[in-house]
Amino acid sequence: MQVDDLVSIIVPVYNAASYVEQTIKMVVKQDYPKWELLLVDDCSTDGSVEVIKQAISRETSKNPELEGKFVLLEGTVNEGAACARNRGIEHARGRYIAFLDADDIWFPEKLFKELAFMKKMNAAFVCCAYEFGDEQARGTGKVVHVPQKLTYQKALSRTVVFTTTVLLDTSKTGKELIRMPNVKSEDTATWWKIMKQGFPAYGLDEVLAIYRRPPKSLSSNKWKAIRRIWYLYRKQEKLSVIYSLYQLVFWAARATLRRI
């Protein structure tokens, strides 16, 4: 049964032993108290599961009221982030679903402010601004702002929706719509899919998250990013070559400005 005011926070975990305890502590410090944290292990090989178990034990020992708020889903096969998030969606009990990557940062007021904004806008899909961080998650001063409203057509050329900032109301979208396809840039493909069904993303233009971006991370490889977005245009969205090129030009320009 869906719990009306509960936010289900889904964290895919793969070899995140260095970060995941910080992630758990960060969620515990959220101003909004009605949450459950689903940690979905994707067959980690670095001891992430044991770190999670120990961290949960410490947190519940310090505060018995946290008992039952943590769910650890252990994987037996490495399937990727999309499948891990989908497992989390299947097990989520909350009306609201938020995504958080194990190496990213939420500010304590993130859930509270986004949920209030969602209710104010009567929205099914919201996101917020975020700041790029270094390997220690220290802000670099480079902020990605979000428009107040982002439709499917506008989103094709501006990938400003960052997974760690997303909050969804499944009483409006249902769960099936937000399941992620098992492709590269599965998160972007999912946001487009949701928008195409008439649920634009409403942006709270306030920095409530930090995107930890090591210099050699996958996301900072620009050529790989271009190939991924091209694949989405042509294979997922079935756009023509001409229209794909048109969108790619604007996407590349905005992506370059965002990273300068």
Where do the protein language model's features map onto the residues?
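Conserved nucleotide-sugar donor-binding catalytic segment
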Residues: 90, 145-224, 228
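N-proximal low-complexity "stem/linker" segments adjacent to membrane-targeting elements
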Residues: 1-29
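A conserved acidic beta->alpha catalytic loop
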Residues: 26, 33, 41-52, 77, ...
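Acidic helix N-cap motif at the loop->helix transition within catalytic regions
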Residues: 18-21, 46-55, 105, 109
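Short aromatic/hydrophobic "clamp" motif used to bind/position activated sugar donors
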Residues: 97
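Short loop->beta transition adjacent to catalytic acidic/histidine clusters or analogous donor-positioning motifs
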Residues: 4-7, 28-39, 47, 68-71
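Conserved donor NDP-sugar-binding/catalytic core segment of glycosyltransferases
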Residues: 109-140
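Glycine-rich, basic loop-to-helix element that forms the pyrophosphate-binding segment
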Residues: 74-92, 113
